[in-house]
């Protein structure tokens, strides 16, 4: 059995662009929780936003915070009510804790739980550290065919799955996706897995378009080619860019669905355009029940995640990982909390 230390190393955000390494106590699992030794943690745009701005909307970093919520690892200890046979199993973590008692939770919409505790959302610590705790049923077993990196990236894959579910993507659909970054690429793969026959990714970056094409999407340069005649059944915005959202709405056929995944605060919405064409405009907020679907998509090979990883860093390089996320040559950046430094973080050119 693995000997568990009393303290661990954590990368802690104390304020805007103020990261330090600290020794923290190793958390002790409650009766319904497991203790996970962290293997891989993906860097998300929200981590970058907290690092650069210290807040996202109403969530403010006003006390020290550990970032990171895309997590995989290995169970090393369990609470009193958890089967000890789980110790040693590799897992992917759904990084949230709903109350399980409110109307939303009882209806199955636990992502909307007003009491939600979500990794790396103030004041809840995340996973840029050696160990984390999570309720037993939110630590999903993964087979050896799924790597630690891919298991961590089941979190952004869950975003893509939730977008496809909310859009109601079905066999034969045409799907337009704005943005060829990680979420756009993942959403394109999920759309194909859900049966879409024409998946179009629009991005102004030639490098991102080339990458999206390598994953089987049809690509367009929205600055040079109109998509209005595409008449998509479903439009998914993964760009957060106002012009892309406006164009995507115009490119959605009557009765179609617009799913907002990107982070634009506001955009002009033509109410007559929506009302007279009976468009369904919706958003997604995280996900519910997506990890088993994500695992099945990875095991079947319908979705590939390992090739999205472009950079890998150690715990001493979290600031470097956060500073480089979002650049054109970067798709997914991974932090290995139990490694101090990686000499050559770039593992593949995203081109």
Predicted regions and their residues:
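N-terminal glycine-rich cofactor-binding segment
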Residues: 10-28, 45-77, 92, 113-123
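Residues in the short beta-alpha loop(s) of Rossmann-like NAD(P)-binding domains
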Residues: 204-205, 264, 287
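C-terminal hydrophobic helical "lid"/dimerization subdomain
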Residues: 1-10, 246, 288, 292-351
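Glycine-rich cofactor phosphate-binding loops and adjacent beta1-alpha1 units
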Residues: 167, 210-280, 342-344
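Mid-domain Rossmann-like dinucleotide-binding core that forms the NAD(H)/NADP(H) cofactor-binding site
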Residues: 144-224
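NAD(P)H dinucleotide-binding glycine-rich loop of Rossmann-like/cofactor-binding domains
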Residues: 97-178
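Glycine-rich beta-strand-centered segment in the early N-terminal region that forms part
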Residues: 27-41, 56-103, 143-145
